Amino acid sequence: ALHVRVVTSVSITALHRENDGWTALSADGQRFRANRVIISGGGCAQPKLGSDGSALRLLTNLGCPATTFAPALTQIITDSTSIKGLSGIRVKAQVAVIDRKSVLNEEDGELLFADYGVSGVCVMQCARYAKDGRMLRVSLVKGMGFADAGEFRRELHQRRKNWAQRPMAEMLTGLCVPRLSAALMRQADWRVTESSLCGQMTADMAERLTKTADAWLLPIRGVKGFESAQVASGGASVADFDPATLQNRRLPGLYA
């Protein structure tokens, strides 16, 4: 037996190196002596589970370099103007975070529209790059079954011919649900009325709708907080620890 003593419900507030060992101090005044210390306190994600970032402060107080925690693998908050009324709709999509003209990250998968913005695995994997002022580009054409934007455009023109007398609001029937179809048309500045027919679609209208379906730009306002995040980015610098042993390079007996 290793004769390890397990102590629970104790908050460690300070860690000091003394002689050849370590002393940990708790909030209620207890002192714990050890030859080695392993810090595995997690980040700030899901604080209701006890992950509040306090373990990182123990390291930074010892001079260990670190990066501030930030929510990662979480939902992205966007401007809600163009996605109003789409909450609950799931689609296959390609999403990318754009900073000016640079693509910072791109993912494929299922996207879920929400009142605050968008969610889904592909969105959450982009969250660490999402910042206020950047854009989230959403492409739906491949999820609709098309190889590229050109094939989508050709389908629109084919429907204009074959469905000339059908209501224009039905132009995307079979490709997406009516609520999403209406939102795409609004974003593409289609002025659809009850009397509008598919045969009245112009080449310019087809081009605008194609651009919207292939590169719908949603202004990013931020991300959901640590309460919603599955993980947090940031933390102690990995360069400060030996990758083979996880021991601190400067402080013997300290592991993280």
Q: Where are these predicted regions, by residue range?
A:
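A conserved short coil-to-beta-strand element within the FAD-binding core of flavoproteins
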Residues: T8-G21
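An anion/pyrophosphate-binding glycine-rich loop and adjacent beta-alpha core
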Residues: C64-T68, Q75-M201
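Glycine-centered tight beta-turn/hairpin loop motif at sheet-sheet or coil-to-beta transitions
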Residues: A27-G29
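Short hydrophobic core segments
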Residues: I12, R31-S51, L59-T60, E110-Y116, ...
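A glycine-rich dinucleotide-binding beta-alpha-beta segment and adjacent secondary-structure elements
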Residues: T8, A183-A256
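Short loop/edge segments at beta-strand edges and connector loops
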Residues: V6-V10, T68-A70, K224
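Short beta-strand to alpha-helix junction loop
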Residues: A1, V7, Q46-S51, T78-T81, ...
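Central helical "cap/lid" subdomain
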Residues: K48-L73, L104
